[in-house]
A protein has these predicted regions:
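Active-site nucleotide/adenylate-binding loops and adjacent lid/helix of ATP-dependent enzymes
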Residues: 2, 7-17, 63, 85-205, ...
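Protein kinase-like catalytic core scaffold
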Residues: 143, 217, 248, 261-264
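Short acidic-glycine loop/turn motifs at beta-strand connectors
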Residues: 211-215, 256-258
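C-terminal active-site "lid" helix and adjoining low-complexity regulatory extension at the edge
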Residues: 241-245, 254-295
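Short, surface-exposed coil-to-beta transition loops
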Residues: 79, 83, 202-207, 247-248
Length: 295
């Protein structure tokens, strides 16, 4: 039997030999399947010094005979992920997601051309640029603001803006947005059409689907909705199984109209597993479709 594929996890910030607690259930599950080896990298050294210090007891043979791997961990900018990818490759570990594939799924505007038939319309702006709210209102009746990766929902920043929003109100709100995102701002500003979501009590009906080389994993509820909530249509989740990345996820939501739309895209390695996900089954799924070369 050949070398097992590797799952690369971040370490605890203060202990490079201990997996970050958030990912301990995943590491245990991955090892428990018997299908993967696991490697840790010092998250502190990586964040503070940009140095990849790897804790891995297995064998690698250098760049030419590199062992395939996936990353499961915290988000990185595309630039930092590229450095991470190359640093691992020099150590004989080849992440299955190349830097350009990571960026495509991680930055929503990059994924947008592949999703636009079933997602919110967007307009993008450079960070800290002046945004003319009157121009936006000509395109969108109701809209929200995020950077290329994240919104600041759950804060004092408005969940959406509409035709009554003045330029002054918008400018003041954007100051708040920048203060919340701080030094983790990503890419640029993305103004999105605001979807009105169907509610089941207090909860929307959102589902996350991971994809591995064109095969969708089981859709999992992702917004604490009740068990009787509708599931996303299979023809919709199948429609988006061929984005140009081997490992990504999409978030689907039921709209107030009863239709369905795509809320977000994400790189598979930095997207969290929904509560209730069968983690060992998830890792068996990844092994079968990412590494076993069979369907």
């Amino acid at each position: 039997m050949g070398q097992k594929p590797i799952v690369v996890f971040p370490s605890d910030y203060f202990s490079s030999k201990t997996v970050d607690g958030e990912y301990m259930p995943e590491r245990n599950a991955a090892l428990g399947t018997g299908l993967f080896d696991c490697a840790l990298f010092s998250y502190r050294k990586w964040e503070e010094q940009g140095i990849l210090s790897l804790n891995f007891s297995g064998n690698t043979s250098g760049e030419e005979m590199s062992v395939p791997a996936i990353y499961r961990g915290w988000m990185m900018s595309p630039e930092k992920y590229c450095k991470f990818y190359m640093s691992l490759l020099q150590k004989g570990i080849r992440l299955i997601t190349a830097p350009q594939e990571y960026k495509l799924a991680h930055y929503f505007p990059d994924a947008y051309p592949y999703l636009k038939a079933d997602t919110a319309k967007i307009t993008i702006y450079p960070l800290h640029s002046k945004i003319n709210v009157e121009e936006i209102k000509k395109t969108f009746g109701r809209f929200m603001v995020k950077d290329y990766v994240k919104s600041v929902k759950g804060t004092k920043f408005p969940a959406f803006f509409d035709e009554n929003t003045t330029q002054k109100q918008f400018d003041e709100a954007m100051k708040l947005f920048y203060s919340y995102r701080g030094d983790i701002l990503s890419g640029g500003i993305c103004v999105k059409q605001h979807f009105i979501l169907k509610k089941y009590g207090q909860h929307s009906n959102e589902w996350r689907v991971f994809y591995a080389k064109g095969i969708p994993c089981e859709a999992m509820p992702n917004s604490e909705q009740p068990e009787n909530a509708a599931r996303p249509p299979q023809n919709l989740t199948e429609k988006y199984k061929n984005l140009p990345s081997p490992y990504y996820c999409l978030d689907y939501a039921e709209l107030e109209t009863g239709q369905w739309g795509i809320l977000e895209s994400g790189d598979g390695g930095v997207s969290g597993l929904p509560h209730g996900q069968d983690i060992p089954a998830y890792y068996r799924f990844l092994h079968k479709f990412l590494f076993a070369n069979k369907v």
